[in-house]
Amino acid sequence: MIIGLSDAFALGGIALSFLVAYQFIYFYFIYSPRAKKLGCAPPVIVFSFPLGLPALYKFATAMLHDNLLEYISIRIADMKVRTGFQTLAGQRWLVTLEPENIKTVLATSFKDYSLGFRYDIMYGLLGNGIFTLSGDGWKHSRALLRPQFSREQVSHLESMRTHINLMINNHFKGGQVVDAQALYHNLTIDTATEFLFGESTNTLDPDLAQQGLPGPKGLVTGEQFAEAFTSALEILSVRVIVGAAWFLIWTPKFWRSCKVCHNFIDYFVYKALATPMEKDQEADRYVFIRELTKETSDPRVIRDQALNILLAGRDTTAGLLSFITYYLGAYPEVYAELREAVLSEFGSTDVETPTFEQLKQCKVLQNVIREVLRLHPNVPLNFRQAIVDTKLPTGGGPNGDQPVFVPKGQNVFYSTYSMQRRTDIWGPDATTFRPDRWNEPREALASGWDYIPFNGGPRICLGQQFALTEASYTIVRICQEFSRIEVLHPDVITSKNSMKQRMRLTQTASGGVITRFIR
């Protein structure tokens, strides 16, 4: 039977009417009574076009134009409250910016939540690792990895020093215009692979980057691995955005990229398993993957964990360094103050490598890093899925001060980016880069739940000290070598504090950070 266009529209209208009716019935006759029984009150409910399709279109458009984080902040602000329901692509999300609610999800009621569909989204590349697993699998991964990120291990700066100096001498010192963000991605993958595998991808050295390694499935170069890793992460980020419909995002290029990454990592895995480290080598040099072989001989476990750590070790630190450079160029007075402090505390040359403790004690440096992480947290958007009926402490009722019922299966979304820019917490200049705010009494809140650039609770980032150490040392070396940073990014000219940001799994500066380092 063939139906006419008018009949098709009529059927579509009927289907949409049923969807609207279902939303109404669910919230007022199913959700609300269950919430009341638990002493909870419903939060604000933002009803949108059925399935939230217009919102999805705006969401996708904002992402394509590198304006997603600002769009989400505006959309949340339009709710007029800080906890409420919104619908996107047929998925009902409980959105919150309340520190107490986020604390409950990540810490107080940690056992009530899982990563939801994140495991399925990322499994193709990352496998069973610390960033994909929940429950007992996650506990085992964390127990396996925690010793590898002890203070003693992350405070070894000599291997970082080699790659940082290579970047400065080969790419920064000539006074040429460079994309600092691209070079920071090279730096962090080189230092991360050195830490993980004992051998670097050497992407900052074109000659070494072209040398192939004999993986189980053929030769692969460090440059090929870096490109494949970036390509695979691009696809994963789109999958995260579309959520439960992630399975629609499938491309042959993704699987080819995964195979290149796995082949590259497997070279180091099988090498580590075949050649145990000698006692004198153990004392001389720390290598993550070799230490892991002392805990397990399963090559798949080692590969998955190494890839998970590599994800965190590269993109988050590169993003942090990129935004630091942007702001230091946009605010020359801040750079002048920072450089004066660095030269006073560390000297003007790289004769001696600073210690982990010295870097942490440089207050001006740490204030700059804290402020950048406030404005640009490593993972600005995140979510958890309830695995049991549970509740949040605040956000319900007409005044938003009553508990909120979270039914099993409900996704709870939180934006660290938006929360860390709230004017009621950080003042009227919350969106402005001002490092000296960390000299004020409210600095104590840095240990609270309104400032969680590395997440919080049991799943707090294991590698945060590694990232902070690398970022700190890199900025110290830049200050020692250059009197001024000239950022040619167009946003510096129009508005220093409203730069476009490209949101994928982590955030980066849209268009790179086009820079000239001046001696």
Curated annotation (Swiss-Prot):
Instruction: Give binding positions for heme.
Output: 479
Specify the enzyme's EC class, one word: oxidoreductase
- The record's EC number reads 1.14.14.-
Cite the GO molecular-function annotations of the record. Answer: heme binding; iron ion binding; oxidoreductase activity, acting on paired donors, with incorporation or reduction of molecular oxygen, reduced flavin or flavoprotein as one donor, and incorporation of one atom of oxygen
Q: Where this protein primarily resides, as one coarse class?
A: membrane
Q: Which UniProt keywords apply?
A: Heme, Iron, Membrane, Metal-binding, Monooxygenase, Oxidoreductase, Transmembrane, Transmembrane helix
Report one GO cellular component: membrane
Extract the CDD domains matched here: CYP52
Keyword check for Glycoprotein, yes or no.
no
This protein's membrane topology, according to the annotation, is:
Multi-pass membrane protein
Looking at the UniProt entry, the stretches that span the membrane are 10-30, 44-64
**InterPro entries (alphabetical):** Cyt_P450, Cyt_P450_CS, Cyt_P450_E_CYP52_ascomycetes, Cyt_P450_E_CYP52_fungi, Cyt_P450_E_grp-II, Cyt_P450_sf
Q: Localized where?
A: Membrane
The coenzyme or cofactor needed here is: heme
Q: Name one Pfam family in it.
A: p450
Q: What does this protein do?
A: Together with an NADPH cytochrome P450 the enzyme system catalyzes the terminal hydroxylation as the first step in the assimilation of alkanes and fatty acids.
Which protein family is it in?
Belongs to the cytochrome P450 family.
Protein's name in the database: Cytochrome P450 52E1
Species assigned in the record: Candida apicola
